[in-house]
Amino acid sequence: MGRTETGDESSARKMRRKVPTSIESLDADILCIIFSFLDLFDLVHCTVVCNSWNAVIKRLKLLQASCRKMHHLGSDSPSSSTSLDRPAEIDVEDFAMKHHKMALLRGRIEIERWEAHSHRVSQCRMKKGLLLTGVGDKVMRLWSLKSYKCMEEYSLPDASSLIDFDFDESKKLEVVSLAWEYFDSVVVVVVEIVGLVGTRISIWRRNGQRSIFPSRAGTFPKGLCMRYIDPEAVVGCEDGTARVFDMYSKTCSQIIRTQGGPITCLSLSDNQLFLSGSSLGRVTVSDPLMDQPVATLKSTITAGGIQTICFNQGTNLAFIGTTGGYVSCWDLRKMDRLWEKRVSPNVVYSIQQLRNDTSVMVAGGIDGVLRMIDQKSGRVLSRVIMDDKFSTTSTRNNQVVIEKRRGKRVSQDMEIDKIERKVRPQISCIAMGMKKMVTAHNGKCISVWKFNLS
């Protein structure tokens, strides 16, 4: 006869089943197997999850092995003149940026699209595996870029009330694991989202809870744009003022008069400087410590309003896109224009670059073409559109249907107007990631572009 299990043993077994596995308790051999499937960029992320993961990656020299693997993929891969066997001589960030650039310019392009909203939306923000979409619909939605699962919804009074939104990386809760493909129980939640709703600042917290700034402190003339870096949000207004709000005291701490016309776009820097673009074609550099603007940048070549501003923290260069299709580069240390080029026959809606990338940026606009642009010269290095062939598949939870396409590169002498509009929907917003980007199209669908060398 088989042994009969006692009640105490049965309870103990159930208790063991219910005890969650901590990431700290995973065996080094198991971690090694999991890490062997990750590329260099995911490995770098994993080094900062916890000390035990960092120790395993360093002890087994997994970063060096990944660098060697990428180095030997082919002659087009970024190379290094130093020995890859000596950890101290590997500049992982430099290697990653070179690989990122090569993927954007020469990699195979895979596109995954899904209907993210029931109404048109024009904006998207991406931070480390999370995507926030909205402006145009009655809700903002927070998505996982691994599973395309909608993790949270944030409701609005009405569809037309949300003008702009943002969230800060520092406001993310802990990540249980960054090896997303191998752990299904990952929970990543944005603690705080800041939105410009009508003439008020609103804050959404976990589970969609919304709070509004007090009437006296949070009301201002019509706001046209907003950016947020904890602890401040800056709102660009129709009357040409930029209003700085302290998110902790919920008060307007400063009003800066730019005298450059309605403010249409903003960009904030880590050192508290912010840039504002106007419909009159001026860019104003402001410092919250001063009541007056630091400088005003104005093109002598082009006319038209400023549509987008992208600031490179590492080089102190500002990239500016206009309604006339021009992109210009300004050195904020000298307040001098370095170059100005017309990259598109139509309005440029969005310019983005990776935070640490000093070589390539991406521009998109009304003609629906993604353009990879050299940051140093303004030369268009590559032009990308969608292929017209596609297939569909459902996510594991059947929450969304994914449309899969290939991207294709367009030669510089090809006339864009002769390409069908269905493969180049207008690009209203770009969110940039490592070897990937997300685009909104002022429609119901969101697109994820992935660039791979392998």
Swiss-Prot record:
F-box domain segment(s): 20-66
Keywords of this entry: Repeat, WD repeat
One of the Pfam families matching this protein, by short name: F-box
Transmembrane helix as UniProt keyword: no
Cystine residue pairs: none
Record-linked SMART domains: FBOX, WD40
Top-level taxon: Eukaryota
SUPFAM superfamilies: F-box domain, WD40 repeat-like
Entries under InterPro entries matching the protein: F-box-like_dom_sf (IPR036047), F-box_dom (IPR001810), FBXW2 (IPR042627), WD40/YVTN_repeat-like_dom_sf (IPR015943), WD40_repeat_dom_sf (IPR036322), WD40_rpt (IPR001680)
Record keyword Repeat present: yes
First and last residues of every WD repeat: 85-116, 117-153, 170-214, 215-255, 258-296, 301-340, 343-383, 422-454
Name listed for the protein in its UniProt record: F-box/WD-40 repeat-containing protein At3g52030
Species for this entry: Arabidopsis thaliana (Mouse-ear cress)
